[in-house]
Amino acid sequence: MQSFIVEQLQGEVVDVYCGGPDVFSGKVESCAGNVLTLAQDGKYTYIAIDKIIALWRAQYP
């Protein structure tokens, strides 16, 4: 998953689903050490790659 994110989604705005009611959104800033870093509105979200169920390019960045 990490190599796919780096090669295909680096710099893209994505939505990330990890289960439950929450979907995380933001621009893919980095993906290293099995952690995905998203940036949105000057704040960062760090997501453990092994917790990701699905991710997709956001329709409305």
For each of these PLM feature ranges, what is it?
Residues M1-P61:
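Conserved RNA-binding domains used in RNP assembly and mRNA/RNA metabolism
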